[in-house]
Structures are given as C-alpha cells and as structure tokens.
Regions:
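Ribokinase/PfkB-type carbohydrate-kinase core domain
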Residues: 1-99, 103-106, 127-129, 137-140, ...
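N-terminal cofactor/phosphate-binding cores enriched in small/glycine residues
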Residues: 89-91, 119-122, 144
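Short, small-residue alpha-helix embedded
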Residues: 110-131, 135
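Hydrophobic transmembrane alpha-helical segments of multi-pass transport and channel proteins
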Residues: 113, 145-146, 150
Length: 171
C-alpha cells in the first residue's frame, strides 16, 4: 500500500494514451512529486497529501484551494478533488471551488472509504457525470462504507439510498 506500481515514464505514457483517446484520467497520487502525473484530468489527494505536495500544511478552505490551484498550474491538471475526511471533499479548478460536506452518520471504520470515494468519482466521471455530480456521488459512497465494519463493499441500493437521503436533506 502506498508504494505505487508505475515506474518512471509509465504513468506519463498511460496519461497520454488516455488523453489521446478522450478518456478522463483520475489519479490517486502517492509521494510528493506530482510531476509524474502531469496532464491527468484530476488528482485526488487527501488534505494531508495535498499539503505535502504543496510544501506546507493546509487546513482551511482557502489554504486547500490555494494549494490545489498551485498544483493545477504546475502540472496541467484540469481540477483537484481534495478528500477531507469528516469534512467531505473539495472540487477545485482555476475558476471555481466547491466544498461538499458529508452527511452526518455514525462511523464504524474508515478502512477503504477513500478508495471507495475515489473509485466512485472516477466511475461517475467516466460515465458522463460532471465533476460536482461525481463528487456528490463519491461523497455518498464513502459515507456508506464508513458506516460498516472493516473493508466493505457498496451496493447500488445503498448508494441510491444515500443519494436520496442527501438530496432530501439539502432540499
């Protein structure tokens, strides 16, 4: 875990192939050198990883937005999705920043929640959702799995229910 499997140049080649094919590239970055992911559609660091890549700790919304925009400019990402644990996630590009709160729920185990959120985000984006809709889906997906013990799978029914509840809570 956290070791990365792509040797130098492999990530860049895969990103180029996907971009040439018109496919979005979503990267769950590891390490501090995000140059290896240059040109990806989006990166999905957690708050701590974002701060490490930016060279400083980030806590507030403004600090997270500033750090994300620095990485966008430096590496050509279209946007950054910063996962923020109990604070949800932030979707940031050079013009806009959306902070998406989590829905209150009892947390049993955070194992796999970030991976679930990122996979749900990438799948939603690939299926044609815009980045904010994809983040809303990802946030709901992560919220379901933290309510389970151990690493857990997410069912369509659970995700649909979570989205329905979050939509009605916002209305």
């Amino acid at each position: 875990y956290g070791k990365g499997i792509l040797l130098d140049g492999v990530a860049a080649e895969l990103i180029a192939i996907c971009r040439d094919a018109g496919k979005p590239v979503v990267v769950d970055p590891k390490g501090r050198d995000y140059a290896r992911y240059a040109g990806a559609t989006a990166i999905t660091p957690n708050r701590k990883e974002l701060g490490e890549a930016a060279g400083r700790a980030v806590f507030s919304d403004d600090e997270i937005v500033a750090a994300a925009r620095e990485l966008i400019v430096a590496h050509g990402f279209a946007f950054v999705v910063a996962t923020r644990s109990e604070k949800g996630m932030s979707v940031i590009d050079l013009v806009d920043a959306r902070h998406i709160a989590t829905q209150a729920r009892e947390v049993f185990d955070v194992s796999g929640a970030g991976d679930t959120a990122i996979a749900s985000f990438a799948l939603s984006l690939a299926a044609g959702a815009d980045r904010v809709a994809a983040a809303l889906i990802a946030n709901a997906a992560g919220g379901v799995v933290v309510g389970k013990r151990g690493t857990a799978r997410l069912t369509v029914e659970e995700l649909t229910g979570a989205l329905f509840r979050s939509h009605h809570a916002a209305a």
